[in-house]
Regions:
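Alpha-helical adaptor scaffolds
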Residues: 1-2, 9-68, 72
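Alpha-helical solenoid repeat scaffolds, predominantly canonical TPR units
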Residues: 8-12, 43, 74-78, 82, ...
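Short coil/turn linkers that connect adjacent helices within long alpha-helical scaffolds
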Residues: 14, 47-48, 105-107, 111-112
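Alpha-helical junction/boundary sensor with strong preference for TPR arrays
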Residues: 16-17, 51, 85-86, 102-105
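Alpha-helical linker/edge segments of TPR/alpha-solenoid repeat scaffolds
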Residues: 33-38, 67-77, 107-108, 112, ...
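Extended alpha-helical scaffolding segments
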Residues: 72, 88-89, 97-108
Length: 139
């Protein structure tokens, strides 16, 4: 009964441009618990575009993409979560793992947007590598 009501509550969650962070994250958790991912990835993507330092939103997006079988995107979102937490070495590790997956052509990786994902991941890998190098020269 509880799962039915949580499923009904998740089904009634709607996101708009006026959705607050709290509504997005709480509604997103309800949708994840109910296994209803429709629209959640889009809402989270829209959110992180305007709030790139929101580690929790990136982490939820990573979980959504993982459940949707979007392994590379999931790893990239996890990396962005680490960047938001200023853990650049961990972010770089995840980005390199995503690059390896793309190069290896592992199952669940290739898709119609694989070249776009690869370009974003390559760019972010260079940016994070530069941040790490800059930090090393300061110390």
């Amino acid at each position: 009964m509880a799962s039915s009501s949580s499923g009904e509550a998740a089904a009634s969650v709607k996101f708009s441009q006026n959705t607050t962070r709290a509504e997005l994250l709480i509604g997103g958790r309800a949708m994840l618990a109910a296994g209803q991912l429709g629209g959640l990835a889009d809402a989270l993507q829209t959110w992180v575009v305007t709030h790139p330092k929101d580690a929790q939103a990136w982490q939820m997006l990573s979980e959504v993409w993982s459940r949707q079988g979007e392994a590379v995107r999931s790893i990239r979102a996890d990396a962005e979560s680490r960047v938001a937490q200023l853990d650049y070495p961990a972010a770089l590790d995840r980005l390199k793992a995503a690059q390896d997956m793309l190069r290896g052509g592992q199952a669940g990786v290739a898709g119609r947007n694989a070249h776009i994902d690869a370009s974003i991941i390559d760019t972010r890998t260079r940016q994070i590598s530069n941040l790490i190098r800059e930090a090393a020269t300061v110390w």
